């Protein structure tokens, strides 16, 4: 990714502001990436609507190093159809040819659009708009977010044909490279798109389509939570929980659209276990553990017996097993963990989910 200078960024922004009002009316309604008043949420909701209408087979196209492989000559020819100001054309071409610096050495760029600048996203959309127009001419339903492309059809046979013709156009006409290993044809439910996936369920004989988080995205989330709450973290518990809450809030701002109440119930319980294991590990000695536990709930009847049971169990079990031990859970209860800052994940999700679904559904109706 390139990091332009302040002057370069200002020039790029000026050029982008000139191009945007010209190309926005020309872009497809099925293009959602790097465009005003459009979002990834709108894209996945549109895909859900297509699936509900019977478009249950998908052509998932992955482009290899898309931003690095844009053909400069072809891109400039596309732009010249609508832009006739020679100064502007020269500026755009200079941006494309500006090169990249590696270890203090500038290398010329013969292809691609430098990432990290203000101009690159709109140039990338201008380039792939050629593919969007082809799909629309052929009557295909699709969603594209930058170089993430999902085309939906009604049958496997149609999907195979679309994959073949799309690959021919992208590689032959646009001179891009389709990643054969990651591009696939299959039932739309289960395929990953922008971190989400669709699922189908039957209720009272009626087929319903929903949105949930893709397993790969969920794994990344769990790995991040694990790293935040790891037993031997050097942060204080207060700092850890403050950061954890902020991370959950930011994560839900995007993934809160998904149906995942049960998933988050499970993860909340798992995260609380991680925190209990961290407490037990950091307290280290039986004496310190006894003292810490006795201070948590001083008015609890038979507290010393409960703490004693914890210490006896710990002789043969490590922190992770201890975190599931009922007597320890009764002291380091959910209520206690929340009192020291553990986030109410399910409550945060429900608030975020309702807000996102209502807002994005209104936006999709407006856009479509």
Residue ranges, per PLM feature:
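Non-catalytic terminal/accessory segments
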Residues: 1-368
């Amino acid at each position: 990714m390139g990091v332009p200078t302040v002057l370069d960024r200002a020039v790029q922004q000026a050029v982008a502001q000139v191009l945007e009002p010209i190309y926005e009316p020309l872009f497809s309604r099925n293009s959602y990436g790097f465009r005003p008043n459009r979002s990834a949420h709108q894209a996945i909701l549109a895909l859900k609507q297509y699936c509900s209408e019977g478009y249950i087979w998908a052509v998932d196209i992955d482009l290899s190093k898309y931003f690095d492989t844009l053909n400069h000559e072809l891109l400039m020819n596309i732009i010249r159809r609508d832009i006739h100001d020679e100064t502007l054309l020269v500026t755009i071409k200079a941006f494309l040819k500006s090169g990249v610096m590696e270890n203090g050495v500038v290398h010329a760029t013969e292809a691609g659009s430098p990432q990290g600048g203000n101009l690159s996203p709109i140039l990338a959309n201008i380039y792939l708009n050629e593919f969007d127009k082809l799909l629309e001419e052929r009557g295909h339903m699709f969603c594209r977010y930058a170089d993430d492309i999902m085309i939906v059809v009604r049958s496997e046979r149609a999907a195979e044909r679309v994959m073949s013709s799309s690959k021919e156009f992208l590689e032959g006409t646009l001179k891009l490279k389709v990643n054969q290993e990651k591009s696939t044809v299959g039932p739309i439910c289960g395929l990953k798109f922008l971190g989400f996936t669709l699922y189908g369920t039957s209720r009272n004989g009626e087929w319903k389509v929903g949105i949930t988080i893709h397993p790969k995205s969920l794994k990344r989330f769990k790995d991040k939570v694990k790293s935040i709450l790891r037993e031997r973290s050097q942060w204080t518990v207060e700092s850890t929980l403050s950061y954890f809450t902020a991370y959950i809030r930011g994560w839900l701002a995007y993934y809160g659209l998904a149906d995942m109440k049960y998933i988050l119930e499970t993860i909340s319980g798992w995260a609380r276990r991680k925190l209990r294991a961290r407490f037990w590990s950091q307290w280290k000695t039986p004496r310190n553990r006894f003292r810490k536990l006795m201070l948590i709930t001083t008015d609890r009847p038979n507290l010393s017996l409960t703490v004693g049971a914890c210490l006896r169990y710990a002789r043969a079990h490590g922190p992770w097993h201890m975190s599931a031990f009922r007597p320890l859970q009764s002291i380091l209860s959910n209520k206690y963990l929340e009192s020291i800052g553990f986030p109410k994940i399910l409550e945060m999700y429900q608030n975020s989910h309702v807000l996102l679904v209502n807002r994005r559904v209104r936006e999709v109706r407006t856009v479509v």
